[in-house]
From Swiss-Prot:
Protein's name according to its UniProt entry: Beta-ketoacyl-[acyl-carrier-protein] synthase III
InterPro entries: ACP_syn_III_C (IPR013747), ACP_syn_III_N (IPR013751), FabH (IPR004655), Thiolase-like (IPR016039)
Keyword Cytoplasm: yes
Pathway(s) where this gene product acts: Lipid metabolism; fatty acid biosynthesis
Keyword set, alphabetical order: Acyltransferase, Cytoplasm, Fatty acid biosynthesis, Fatty acid metabolism, Lipid biosynthesis, Lipid metabolism, Multifunctional enzyme, Transferase
Chief location category: cytoplasm
HAMAP family reported for this sequence: FabH
Domain notes for this protein: The last Arg residue of the ACP-binding site is essential for the weak association between ACP/AcpP and FabH.
Organism: Coxiella burnetii (strain CbuK_Q154) (Coxiella burnetii (strain Q154))
């Protein structure tokens, strides 16, 4: 049997830091309130730097390729999860292909599942490798949500940061990704929006979110999906070594960890330093944990994410 196994990870965050103290000068909020309600102390932001969605994706990809120890010429697919592409078209994936000078006989495409984008992309890549359609896939989660937040809306501008994370998935005989599950419910599509498109435009496509409703649904749906994927995989909660959640809200993360019976020290947390980086948050956290020596080869990881759509998903894997 062929598995999709993570061979390398990489990430990138902009240099400029926006702290809660900075936000106190911009909107009516406090560091104490943000930490208690969300768990974010600072976030990295593109601001006026040369960074953008494409450049961050490229930098994260380079680091993942380097860790994987592969020649970039063997990459035979690129999938990018993003909701903040630099252009309507071409896709971010094609721009990554260009900047990395990858060969042309490969597919390269974006998928938009908002904050769940990386898990969605990982699931698609897993199916291609299992079915023999590819052997080395570059999967990237990247977003620049600080470019679409309303900096006068204290309920949302405190949440988000920018960044990118990438993995190299390689066909392998040893277990890698064990299972993925993806769900969506468009009936809740109005709960998180950034309305800018061909048919509906805002002069500035500000992000709007009904926070209380999203919080309740996230706790419920993520709790259900982690139970579902563990059962589907024939495992027990005690088999999970690490939870790597989407870094949206510390209270949501704690609710999922409690449901799994995992102590805080077995949960990878970067929300305090990064904020919510949308599709980038899981690969960013994974990269940080691997490079810090926390997560090691053979560990069983549970990834889960929830975002606009509403779309949510989970992945269970052996590193």
């Amino acid at each position: 049997m062929t598995y999709a196994r993570i061979q390398g990870v990489g990430s990138y965050i902009p240099q400029q830091i926006l702290s809660n103290a900075d936000l106190e000068k911009m909107v009516n909020t406090t560091d104490e309130w943000i930490m208690q309600r969300v768990g974010v102390r600072e976030r990295h932001v593109i601001a006026n730097s040369p960074d953008n969605t494409t450049t961050m994706a490229v930098d994260a990809a380079k680091r993942a390729i380097e860790m994987a120890g592969i020649d970039s010429a063997v990459i035979d697919m690129i999938i990018v999860g993003t909701a903040t592409a630099e252009y309507y078209f071409p896709s971010t994936a094609c721009l990554v292909q260009k900047h990395l000078n990858l060969r042309e006989d490969i597919p390269a495409f974006d998928i938009n599942a908002a904050c769940a984008g990386f898990v969605y992309a990982l699931s698609i890549a897993d199916q291609y490798i299992r079915n023999g359609g590819a052997k080395h896939i570059l999967v990237i989660g990247v977003d620049s949500l600080t470019k679409v937040v309303d900096w006068k809306d204290r309920s949302t501008c405190i949440l988000f940061g920018d960044g990118a994370g990438a993995v190299i998935l390689q066909a392998h005989k040893e277990p890698g990704i064990l299972n993925t599950i993806l769900h969506a419910n468009g009936d809740y599509s109005d709960l998180i929006t950034a309305k800018s498109g061909v048919w509906e435009r805002e002069s500035v496509p500000h992000l709007h979110m009904y926070g209380k409703e999203v919080f309740k649904l996230a706790v419920t749906k993520l709790g259900e999906i982690v139970d579902e994927i563990i059962e589907k995989s024939g495992l027990k909660q005690s088999d999970i070594d690490w939870l790597i959640p989407h870094q949206a809200n510390l209270r949501i993360i704690e609710a999922t960890a409690k449901r799994l019976g995992l102590p805080r020290e077995r949960v990878i947390l970067t929300i305090e330093q990064h904020g919510n980086t949308s599709a980038a948050s899981i690969p960013l956290a994974l990269d940080a944990a691997v490079r810090a020596g926390k997560i090691k080869r053979g560990d069983t990881l549970l990834l889960e994410a929830f975002g606009a759509g509403l779309a949510w998903g989970a992945a269970l894997l052996k590193l």
